[in-house]
Amino acid sequence: MKGLVGKKLGMTRIFTKDGISIPVTVIEIKANRVTQIKNLDSDGYLALQITTGTKKASRVNKPKAGHFAKANVEAGRGLWEFRVSEQDATVFLGHTFEVSMFKPGDIVDVTGKSKGKGFSGTVKRWNFRTQDASHGNSLSHRVPGSIGQNQTPGKVFKGKKMSGQLGNERVTIQNLEVVRVDVVREILLIKGGVPGAVGKDVIVKLAVKA
């Protein structure tokens, strides 16, 4: 398997032997436990479903509790799925993947849910330029301006950049470098920033474009 699920703990910096400061994101990756193995016969594709972390038994509904019990694993805080090859699909239920799967120098893609910033205008959301502050303009400083053309086409095209929800969406940052792997504390140090707020789940995969 080429990916793991972890929790973003925040950012810090480390120093090289030459005294160069490197900004890093700290990601805690507890053991990822296999809860289901999907195959071509029953599901039409090969994948491993995994969970990580823990969850109070009182907060797990009966279908989920039965699903975890069938795999004989402790209930985790969520379920994630990774497409795998036939060779990787030969593991057994309850098998664990550790942070030691990565090594310093690996290039990874990190996926998470970006911080929600609420309803935002076009200047903040799409980097539109503002209109004149004066010279006859008294009401239209931060408005987007015209959103259409004329009688033809007589509509606003789908995908038009307008005001709306900013953030709170799935984002992937590609080609980040693994700087350090701490197997004892189960943490990964990745150069640069990754999507999401502190404490939120992120998916770390080996880069597809490296």
Curated annotation (Swiss-Prot):
Listed SUPFAM superfamilies: Translation proteins
Record PTM: Methylated by PrmB.
UniProt GO BP: translation
Residue ranges, annotated region (Disordered): 133-156
Keywords, ordered alphabetically: Methylation, Ribonucleoprotein, Ribosomal protein, RNA-binding, rRNA-binding
A GO-annotated cellular component: cytosolic large ribosomal subunit
Modified residues (N5-methylglutamine): Q151
InterPro entries, per database record: Ribosomal_uL3 (IPR000597), Ribosomal_uL3_bac/org-type (IPR019927), Ribosomal_uL3_CS (IPR019926), Transl_B-barrel_sf (IPR009000)
PROSITE patterns for the chain: RIBOSOMAL_L3
Role according to the record: One of the primary rRNA binding proteins, it binds directly near the 3'-end of the 23S rRNA, where it nucleates assembly of the 50S subunit.
Subunit structure and binding partners: Part of the 50S ribosomal subunit. Forms a cluster with proteins L14 and L19.
HAMAP family: Ribosomal_uL3_B (MF_01325_B)
Protein name: Large ribosomal subunit protein uL3
Gene label: rplC
